[in-house]
């Protein structure tokens, strides 16, 4: 036998729950009474907005700086040996990652907060 | 129309339907009333950001289910803190706002023993007779996963009864 049919035949779908007398008559009024006059938005988003813009500016500067540091070798110096650039790059990369971490620590922001700002802003 | 009046009309239209959905999840009238109040409070505070392209009933049902699940977690925490071991069926049979028989109380106990998602899917499908496409929008889960959850839930409930027959 189909298992769903087994449950239906054994128990059925009757609603066995009850409510106090007149509960639904006053429900709308009771709900409306418990609501604040105006919707209460989270204060955090307004308070933290300037911090978010500052963090976004720092990130933009870091990205621009990283792009400048890692521009093609030919543009840096046509006379510099290719081997020297190849050796220098991992060091620069480590250094750039360090800047990101330091900046994130400094701003005391984590990814969840950044996502929250983006969600609030758009 | 004034926003508050508009919201009041919404409360009037959906409160009873939402109450019964919540009640089937949290089981007691007291909890269901608290969860319903919280559901409308959350909806009111987020009313300005509600996407008007979405279905209002889907949005409200989603909030109600999330609030109900939170309530169950709080109850679980309180129950384990108090080391209560009264079964769900016994509690229901002693509840003045439950007029079901022992078999109906057993079904509620079997549903209560399911993991959160299976419990919610079973309630929406079995009692509310909701389409999988609608449940999918509410729970943001694929229809395939929902069908699997429902199938497992039905199987577990059947086994629950057969073990006690």
How should these model regions be labeled?
Chain B
Residues 38-55, 75:
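Sigma70-family region 2
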Residues 5-8, 27, 78-82, 137-140, ...:
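C-terminal edge and immediately downstream basic/flexible tail or linker adjoining helix-turn-helix-like DNA-binding
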Residues 18, 22, 32-43, 63, ...:
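Short, small-hydrophobic-rich alpha-helical interface motif
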Residues 58, 65, 69, 139-164:
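DNA-recognition helix of helix-turn-helix
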